[in-house]
A protein has these predicted regions:
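Acidic, serine/threonine- and proline-rich low-complexity regulatory tracts
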Residues: 83-166, 175-360
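Short amphipathic alpha-helical linker/capping segments at the junctions of internal repeats
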Residues: 1, 77, 134-136
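Short, recurring structural edge motifs at helix starts
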Residues: 7-11, 38-44, 52-55, 59, ...
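Short, structured motif recognition centered on aromatic/hydrophobic residues
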Residues: 19-27, 48-55, 63-69, 74, ...
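Short, flexible domain-boundary/linker segments around small modular repeats
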Residues: 4, 33-36, 92-98
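Structural preference for solvent-exposed beta-strand-turn elements
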Residues: 73-82
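N-terminal BTB/POZ boundary and linker segment
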Residues: 1, 12, 17, 21-51, ...
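Alpha-helical oligomerization interface recognition
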Residues: 1-3, 62
Length: 360
């Protein structure tokens, strides 16, 4: 099946195939082939260790159905269209309005590394954009590694994996173990204390070494972040700061009240650039969306009263489409900001691979 295998004969003359892949990864492949639709109903952050293992093996051994299912799952959270991105962002909001994407979506560092490894280009623009919204120190520091499935307890009791399995075996299994692991595989406390020579039940262990981007991808992320921030200031200068009133403006005094409203939008955008106040640092798409939300706010103080922005309906009707066009322009430029090909080329290449029985 692969040039990485070799045939040997043991004492009983049975052929034995030696695989270079981890047995735990091979264990997941049948579930990805026949039961992926069921297990992909879990939150993506819980599915990702399973998905990445199945995707690697399905690409390596030319198994088209699980490969297509895994890619579709990835593309649903790292899309190529602005409408799908907005849907993803709405899904990341907690019931109280708190933005917590990592509760539903794995770190983009894992996604970028996986996409680079398997040459899946269509998910890279959204993943780079997702990562570039965070501070530089947080990006450079990396993220925690994914839990990994093991079948044998390490011999070193002071190793991170051993400490994780020996002190909290039952907790780790119940918290992180995917539902496709049969209940009969649950590890007992006596098995968890056995030596390295004895196999135990499959369990997920957590390493401690952070996972980081490659140097080239880290540089691309920082450069893209700077360009993202400049896009906000460019939009403010061209579409908001000195925006004239509409030709049909109904406000007396040459539309001075509408000019003041645009000034207030500019000022409040600069006060919370990139959504810092909302915990969304460096997000120009969110920042421009907030400009539309400001039109409906009623907390503007006029003396002792709270009012909405003093903007007439005509100016409002012209400003909202300009903001939508600005958001779409930002989205269309994201691949170029991170030295990637356009969306349609990346998507077409991945779709072409999905339709084939094997990679070229």
């Amino acid at each position: 099946m692969t040039d990485c295998t070799q045939q040997k004969t043991i004492q009983l003359s049975f052929p034995v195939t030696y695989w270079t892949d981890y047995f735990t990864a091979m264990l997941l492949l049948p579930y990805g082939r026949y039961r992926a639709c069921r297990y992909f109903r879990q939150p993506f952050v819980q599915d990702f260790p399973f998905l990445s293992s199945v995707l690697r093996l399905s690409c390596k051994y030319f198994i088209c159905i699980p490969r297509r299912q895994c890619l579709e799952r990835l593309q649903s959270y790292f899309p190529t269209t602005l409408a799908e991105w907005d849907r993803r962002e709405r899904m990341s909001l907690a019931p109280d309005g708190h933005y917590d994407p990592r509760h539903e979506i794995p770190s983009p560092i894992h996604v970028i590394n996986l996409a680079r490894e398997l040459n899946v280009g269509s998910i890279l623009p959204a993943a780079f954009y997702d990562l570039a919204r965070y501070g530089t120190s947080k990006t450079a520091g990396g993220t925690e590694p994914l839990p990994r499935l093991v079948l044998e307890v390490p011999s070193s009791e002071d190793s991170p994996a051993s400490a994780s399995t020996s002190t909290s075996t039952s907790t780790s299994t119940s918290t992180f173990a995917p539902t496709f692991v049969p209940s009969s595989w649950t590890a007992s406390s006596s098995e968890a204390t056995c030596g390295a020579s004895r196999f135990t039940s499959p369990m997920l262990v957590q390493d401690t070494t952070p996972v980081r981007l490659s140097h080239d991808d880290l540089v691309l992320t920082f450069r893209g972040r700077e360009t993202m921030q400049r896009s906000v200031s460019a939009f403010l200068s061209s579409q908001v700061k000195d925006r004239p009133p509409s030709a049909g403006c109904t406000v007396p005094g040459a539309g001075q009240a509408c000019r003041d409203a645009f000034y207030f939008i500019t000022l409040n955008t600069l006060r919370a650039v990139g959504g810092i106040a909302a915990g969304r640092d460096g997000d120009p798409l969110f920042t421009l969306g907030q400009m539309i939300d400001m039109l409906h706010h009623t907390e503007w103080v006029d003396g002792q009263y709270l009012r909405g922005l003093p903007m007439c309906g005509k100016c409002r009707d012209e400003f909202i489409p300009a903001v939508h066009a600005g958001r779409q322009a930002i989205w269309d430029q994201i691949p170029a900001w991170f030295a990637l090909e356009p969306y349609d080329i990346l998507k077409a290449r991945d779709d072409e691979l999905n339709e084939r029985d094997m990679y070229p």
